């Protein structure tokens, strides 16, 4: 155990949860990939998709390890550089991005043959930047006008480029920004004012899109159709949602067994948006509940690590990059059970795709970097306490020796 602790720093419970997620993802991904083999017809077998997923997980764990060894104080200057890089990637995706799995918006770019979704990277960087700004002004008084350029301008630029091709990610990103602002003691009146302004700007954007539909093809129609489909009682329109519910019901308490899902062949997005339904069908309510419990444990560890962090930046950074992982997981599960409209949000570790896994691992590496510093501080505190105890014991021994010598001298005088 000591050998592992020498290399794996930070919260050991979070490390355990991460490894559980990684191991539990293999069988569902292997099972659900049979539908990908049929739909994509690329010549890759289910075993090939499993090997690919194992490789992505292995690379993700390496990302966690490398980042968690990096002192998190260096993330503050890197956040500004990362923000510029994310804007370049987002702009390139808007201009020359590709569509994957039927999406009608350019969300992906290819780097060395690997598909990459810049919005996932942009979310982590933006929340890191917001945490850095709030840490800088934490003890100072400032007006809303003074925070427009350093805070809101980067937020608006990032959200604008993310929301156009991906409304659900943009909405989640804005919600996470507001959460970090609230925890970082940004004045509530400024938060409310900016939220009202955001609603007005979004309404104006919708009017512009309606007035010039050729400039923004299909986007408003897609958002509208998803909401209407969710509200509709027509089972034909709710094809995927209905099949997902059927998969969950057929799973029962114990499930059909690993690889025995029937609905995976009827769900076009069974390996991504609705993979939780496949998990419940094969492993039952018991397996689905275990997955939910893992997300809850992960959330608890994020809160504990944040409370133990020794700096304001560390506290905000953990919650800023950590909570979106849990939030994204619950949104994906909510879509599968029919509580939410289809959003396109991934189930961390389970959804096929390198971007989802690697960006999740990047965020977890940042959290563990903060945790490693806290653990190191605690270890130093314990060592200092032990040293003080040893010094006190030594002083007591020396005092006892002096008392003994005095007693001996008294005895010698009497003799």
Predicted ranges, named:
Residues 166-172, 256-258, 270-272, 340-343, ...:
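Transmembrane helix boundary and interhelical junction motifs in multipass membrane proteins
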Residues 30-46:
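Inter-helical loop and helix-membrane interface segments of multi-pass membrane transporters/permeases
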Residues 2-18, 75:
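N-terminal membrane topogenic signal
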Residues 19-22, 42-237, 277, 281-337, ...:
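Hydrophobic alpha-helical transmembrane segments of multi-pass inner membrane proteins, especially
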Residues 248-286, 313:
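Long extracytoplasmic/lumenal interhelical loops at the membrane interface
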Residues 1-3, 143, 330-394, 399-415:
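A juxtamembrane structural motif centered on a specific transmembrane helix
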Residues 20-34:
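Alpha-helical transmembrane segments of multi-pass membrane proteins
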């Amino acid at each position: 155990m000591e050998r592992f602790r020498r290399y794996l720093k930070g919260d050991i419970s979070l490390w355990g949860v991460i490894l559980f997620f990684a191991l539990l993802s293999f069988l569902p991904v292997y099972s659900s990939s049979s539908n990908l083999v049929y739909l994509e017809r690329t010549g890759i077998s289910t075993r090939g998709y499993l090997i690919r997923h194992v490789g992505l997980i292995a690379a993700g764990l390496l990302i966690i390890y490398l980042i968690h060894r990096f002192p998190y104080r260096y993330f503050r200057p890197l956040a500004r550089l990362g923000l510029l890089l994310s804007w370049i990637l987002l702009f390139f995706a808007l201009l020359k991005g590709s569509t994957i799995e039927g999406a009608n918006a350019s969300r992906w770019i290819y780097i060395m043959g690997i598909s990459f979704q810049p919005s996932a990277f942009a979310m982590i960087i933006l929340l890191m930047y917001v945490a850095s700004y709030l840490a800088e002004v934490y003890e100072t008084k400032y007006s809303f006008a003074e925070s427009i350029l350093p805070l809101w301008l980067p937020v608006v630029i990032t959200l604008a480029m993310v929301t156009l091709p991906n409304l659900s990610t943009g909405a989640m990103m804005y919600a996470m920004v507001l959460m970090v602002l609230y925890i970082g003691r940004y004045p509530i009146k400024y938060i409310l004012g900016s939220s009202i302004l955001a609603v007005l700007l979004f309404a104006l954007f919708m009017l512009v899109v309606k007035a010039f539909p050729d400039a923004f093809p299909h986007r408003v129609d897609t958002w509208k159709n998803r909401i209407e489909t969710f509200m509709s009682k027509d089972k034909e329109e709710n094809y995927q949602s209905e099949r997902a519910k059927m998969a969950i019901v057929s799973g029962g308490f114990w499930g059909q067994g690993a690889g025995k899902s029937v609905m995976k062949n009827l769900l076009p997005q069974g390996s991504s948006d609705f993979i939780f339904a496949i998990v419940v069908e094969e492993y039952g309510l018991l397996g689905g509940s275990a997955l939910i419990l893992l997300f809850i444990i992960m959330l608890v560890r994020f809160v504990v690590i944040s409370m133990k962090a020794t700096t304001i930046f560390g506290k905000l950074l953990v919650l800023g990059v950590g909570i979106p992982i849990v939030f994204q997981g619950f949104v994906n599960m909510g879509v599968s059970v029919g509580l939410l409209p289809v959003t396109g949000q991934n189930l961390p570790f389970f959804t096929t795709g390198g971007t989802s896994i690697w960006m999740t691992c990047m965020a977890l590496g940042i959290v563990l970097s903060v945790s490693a510093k806290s653990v190191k501080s605690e270890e130093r505190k314990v060592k200092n306490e032990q040293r003080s105890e040893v010094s006190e014991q030594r002083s007591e021994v020396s005092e006892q020796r002096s008392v003994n010598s005095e007693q001996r001298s008294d005895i010698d005088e009497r003799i």
